[in-house]
Design a protein with these regions (language model features):
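Terminal membrane/secretory targeting segments in land-plant proteins
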Residues: 1-26, 204-206
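Folded extracytoplasmic luminal domains of secretory or organellar precursors
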Residues: 22-206
């Protein structure tokens, strides 16, 4: 019996290993086609080489990490916006003691309720010390809160004031990609995540 040449043997072994590794991989375009913004989904996720070999959960984790970076940027933009518009002549003056200005108070409360707080919640929910914790935190957030998230920073934007930064403007890539991430996360088999113990996911400051 003729012995198989060593080169052929290792070539076949490599092919088998690659096939096994890719066995659980999902088609990126097909997965993204289920989201509301498939082109954005493909464009963002394909930039990460790991997306080519990722299974459903792996793809969701890549999306979560990307959305987390966007959330940090958005959170900074929100704080910069609040700081830049908080003197006595601008819309968020209630935060600096001008309680007599009813409109300023309304604007300030609106900004907190529809812009600052929801974005902070997203930033914290997309955090985890490891992949498992990050996935559970994001999954619980999307299944419990995101469907009711009425985030709209422009709702409180007064005509004549400087335009909001792109990342927190209506229809921004951050807003769209959060919807993409939600869909990808909720498609991972395994069912809903039970409520976490108090403060288990209350982090996201790193």
């Amino acid at each position: 019996m003729t012995t198989m040449p060593r080169r052929v043997f290792f070539l076949l072994l490599f092919v088998v290993c690659v096939s096994l590794a890719a066995d659980g991989a999902v088609d990126l375009k097909e997965s993204c086609s289920t989201t509301r913004y498939p082109e954005l989904c493909v464009s963002v996720l394909s930039a990460n080489p790991a997306s080519k070999m990722a299974d459903t959960r792996g793809l969701a984790l890549i999306a979560i990490r990307t959305a987390a970076k966007m959330a940090k940027e958005a959170n900074k933009a929100v704080h910069d916006e609040l700081e830049a518009n908080s003197d006595e002549k601008t819309r968020y003056s209630f935060g600096r003691g001008n309680a007599k200005d009813t409109q300023a108070r309304r604007d300030y409360d609106c900004f907190l309720d529809y812009c600052m707080h929801p974005i902070q919640a997203a930033k914290e929910a997309l955090y985890g010390r490891d992949d498992d914790e990050m996935y559970k935190s994001a999954r619980y957030y999307f299944q419990a809160d995101y469907g009711r998230w009425d985030w709209n920073c422009e709702r409180c934007h007064i005509p004549g004031t400087p335009k909001l930064p792109n990342i927190i403007s209506k229809g921004s890539d951050f807003d769209k990609f959060m919807k993409v991430t939600s869909k990808l996360v909720m498609q991972v088999p395994g069912g809903d995540i039970p409520p976490p113990p108090p403060n288990e996911f209350a982090n996201g400051t790193s």
